[in-house]
Regions:
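Short beta-strand segments
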Residues: 28-62, 70, 77-81
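Alpha-helix boundary recognition
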Residues: 25-26, 71-72, 133
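Short histidine-centered beta-strand/loop micro-motifs
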Residues: 58-61, 68-69, 108-109, 130-132
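Helix-adjacent hinge/juxtasegments
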Residues: 59, 64-99
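Aromatic-glycine hotspot motif
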Residues: 11-14, 18-29
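A short beta-turn/loop motif at secondary-structure boundaries
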Residues: 39-41, 84-87, 130-134
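Charged, gly/pro-rich active-site loop segments
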Residues: 2-16, 90-172
Length: 172
């Protein structure tokens, strides 16, 4: 991405502004959480999330692989992005140390995250309520130590690909 073209023009896409990063981190999107397993394999899963201050919070269960990985190696990467067809791509990759929050504090945080993704009516459905209350008993707190961002949507190529019929639609 950071290479120059043969004509000497810089082809690096523009970066997101701090307010654009804040906007993406406040949207109802899916975060991709990456942890490192004991055999040095990467475990990556799609997760609900919420940002509070300089931390990203993700609900999970102590029975999951990600919990076991983070208990042994408390460091993670999280990618939160908007990906559409062509080069209509914007996002942030956050890397940092992890704290595992448990007990009543985790229950309260997780409930707030659930409200971001599920309506009150949905939370009152017994099957959904049981799944979320029993399944999400831990909160992963990722301290935003390092943030990398991209904004290919506002690059010259990204704008050109938004012209009708220049890119193919992604499958839903």
């Amino acid at each position: 991405m950071a290479s120059n073209s043969s004509s000497g023009h810089d082809v690096r896409p523009p970066s997101l502004t701090p307010s654009e990063i804040d906007k993406i981190l406040s949207m109802t999107l899916i975060a991709n959480l990456a942890t490192l397993g004991e055999d040095d394999t990467i475990h990556i899963v799609p997760m609900w999330f919420m940002r509070f201050g300089n931390d990203i919070f993700i609900p999970t269960s102590r029975l999951t692989r990600k919990y076991k990985n983070l208990k042994a190696r408390p460091y993670a990467s999280v990618m939160i992005d908007i990906s559409r067809e062509g080069l209509d791509l914007k996002g942030a990759l956050i890397r940092g140390p992890v704290e595992l929050v448990e007990g009543e504090e985790a229950r309260k945080i997780n409930h707030q995250i659930h409200l971001k993704y599920v309506t009150e009516e949905g939370l009152n459905d017994p099957s959904i309520a049981l799944y979320l209350s029993k399944g999400d008993d831990v909160t992963v707190r990722i301290h935003m130590g390092h943030i990398v961002n991209w904004n290919l949507a506002d690059s010259k190529a990204g704008r050109a690909l938004r012209i009708k019929d220049r890119s193919r639609q992604l499958d839903a």
